[in-house]
Amino acid sequence: MNSKSIVWMVRAAALTVAACVSGSQAGDGLRIATWNISNYNGGRTSDIQTAVYGTFDSRSMSPDVLVCQEVLSLSGMNALVSILNSAPGSPGDWQAGPFIDGPDTDSALLYRASKVVFLGVHTLPADPGTTGAPRDVRRYDIGLVGYAALSTQLSMYSVHMKAGSGSTDQARRLIEARRIRDDAELLDPAINIMVLGDFNIQSSSQSAYIELTGFQANNNGRFFDPIATPGSWNNNSSFRFVHTQDPSGAGGMDDRHDQILVDEALGDGAGLEYIGLFGVPYATTTWDDPNHSYRSWGNDGSSYNTSLTTNGNTMVGPAIAIALRNVAAGGGHLPVFLDLRVPGKITADTTVDLGEVPFGSVVAGELAAGNGGDVGLWGPAGISDVTYSLDADAGLSINPGPYLDSAGGSLNTHTFQADLADDPGGGSFSADIRVLSDDPDVPVLTVHVIGTVVGCHIADMAVPFGTLDFFDALAFLDAFAQGLPAADLNGDGVLDFFDVLEFSSLFAAGCP
């Protein structure tokens, strides 16, 4: 048996090792990006394509979901879809959620239809005048292709909060933050939440940030910074690797205005998961933090208080860096992204047919089970291990586990014993083995074990099975007289005296 029976602490260690993501390669799992794209109404085609699909040192942004702010119109959003689908290296499967024209600039949801299912959009409206939120907040609800459970869904709040550091600006951001948290608290607790975009917040001590991330009586709407990097970000070189603004303007790179805050459930070690060591502070000495998939795309830390470094940019190289500066258009932002690992998918034999089983015997069977996650879609590193145990009906004996399996390899093989051939009348038998897993869609997968009861050996030819009697002798003589293969007990292809001797010997010995 090649089944990989494990203890649970091994699973935790495996998840920790898998979380180390050196280099933030695109392709595996689900990559979600946010980008304030600077008053966009079309154009900048080459720069956007290079920024998104350009490659440097095997790295590319290549998101699966792109949530944009400062989109000016439906035509602007449609232009983005066209630009992404026509970009060299694009899979060409980009679609957009509905565009809603609110006050000021707006958000847009772009997503790859091969990976993402659009579920709906909800608006948290802006406030009139200058009293609160200057722009609508969009909540985009999405699911994953191939998954149905609520725990695989995401509700993403796209924000573009009030700019400025004055007390009035901060008060208006607080109003917006409260509105987001109040809405998130009403969602089903199983749904994952995320807030992303241009927060325009200078410090984690400001009231809006505390409202979003702080402990409250109802924590269903609480958000967390996956890279655990609080502080006073503005004009502070300690945060030079996570700054996002401004790559092109006179102020230079000195603010962490653009962020992605997430549900704590995305770091609990089960189901849909952040790829990285959730809650571990981001490195302060390198952009290439192996503990995180979270990146401020294009910021290699060499641009503090100046425009984005192009020549010698160690994260994205000159071509992508120039494209990012051009898209920012003199007062813009860098994209931010992170990667999520999708849950494992349990798969197993649906039926194990033991065939003909001699009455009263105990026979062995084999069951294949393991991780059937779609590696063609999500990549082997983008799918969580599946963990499972086995539970069997009476008459079946199997090691319950627990077990773990990674996607993309061969399934585990489990041997079991079946003591089911107990019907002297013959006929079929059946029993079930249940595969109990952490697959959110199929927590219980039932495997049917079937077979047919036959005589205890070849001379036990008639019911009741398990006893050699007058009826077995009649059955043998009848088969012999008709020249049937069933009477060829010695298997030499000829019905003769030696078959009669063989029957007599077996008859005398009886059933085991």
Region locations from a protein language model:
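Acidic glycine-/aspartate-rich tracts in secreted/extracellular proteins
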Residues: 38, 72-73, 85-86, 115-116, ...
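Divalent cation-coordinating acidic motifs and surrounding scaffolds
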Residues: 26-344, 383-384, 449-454
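Acidic active-site catalytic centers that drive phospho-/nucleotidyl reactions
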Residues: 36, 64, 198-200, 258, ...
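Boundary/junction segments of secreted and surface-exposed precursor proteins
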Residues: 19-32, 344-361, 454-470
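Short acidic, glycine/proline-rich loop/turn micro-motifs
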Residues: 166-168, 362, 488
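Bacterial N-terminal signal peptides that target proteins for export
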Residues: 2-13
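Feature for long, exposed domains in two main contexts
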Residues: 342-456
